[in-house]
Swiss-Prot record:
UniProt protein name: Putative NADH dehydrogenase/NAD(P)H nitroreductase Smlt0482
A Pfam family assignment: Nitroreductase
EC number: 1.-.-.-
Lineage: Bacteria, Pseudomonadati, Pseudomonadota, Gammaproteobacteria, Lysobacterales
CDD domains named among the record's database cross-references: RutE-like
InterPro entries in alphabetical order: Nitroreductase (IPR029479), Nitroreductase-like (IPR000415), Nitroreductase_HadB/RutE (IPR050461), RutE-like (IPR023936)
Family classification: Belongs to the nitroreductase family. HadB/RutE subfamily.
Length: 196
């Protein structure tokens, strides 16, 4: 890296960015979602496994499929959000490693039962989901990540017959400041970190 980002960029990505609970009635074009993914894909994962799989739920029909899986507290805001990204992970991610990591037989590291790949898929897929939040902010979108849903119902509705499992959801769009809660505190360096 040649230089640090300026303060305005750091604010947009971290310091002044907020988890959004309400969004303006402003559509997010499919071209912007493609641009978003084209940033996310460059984020690092172990052995370039890139196990995350994304479904961008935008249509009324797809939202209706998602609705029964949502917790009560997440239902209304998700139905109103322009986009809900389902962040999934593919338990058969290793099948693409001959292409993604060709300089050694990385696929062999993960051969065997799917259960043995779950940890790597979840860990690296979660990284990619975090990259999605930051990439969305970098592109001028707001994000509202959520865990309150029934993964089995999401998997049945969107990933049936595949090796993909849902991890978490992220509402995307242009945030409505009226829906923000007061800013919550964060732990200080001394509370959360140490230098060994």
């Amino acid at each position: 890296m040649s230089h640090a980002l300026d303060a305005a960029a750091l604010d947009q990505l971290f310091r002044t960015a907020r988890t959004q609970n309400a969004f303006l009635d402003k559509p997010v074009p499919a071209s912007l979602l493609q641009e978003l993914y084209d940033l996310v894909k460059w984020g690092p994962t172990a052995a370039n496994t890139t196990p995350a799989r994304f479904v961008f739920v935008t249509s009324k029909e797809a939202k209706a499929k998602l609705a029964p899986a949502l917790s009560e507290g997440n239902h209304d805001k998700t139905m109103a959000a322009p986009v809900t990204a389902i962040i999934g992970f593919d338990l058969d991610f290793h099948e693409k490693l001959p292409y993604l990591f060709p300089h050694t037989d990385a696929k062999a590291w993960f051969d065997g039962p799917q259960e043995g790949r779950h940890e790597a898929a979840l860990r690296n897929g979660s990284l990619q989901g975090a990259y999605l939040i930051l990439a969305a902010r970098a592109l001028g979108l707001d994000a509202g990540p959520m865990s309150g849903f029934d993964p089995a119902k999401v998997d049945e509705a969107f990933f049936a017959g595949t090796s993909i499992k849902s991890n978490f959801l992220v509402n995307l769009g242009y945030g409505d400041p009226a829906g923000l809660f007061p800013r919550l505190p964060r732990l200080s360096f001394d509370e959360a970190a140490r230098i060994a």
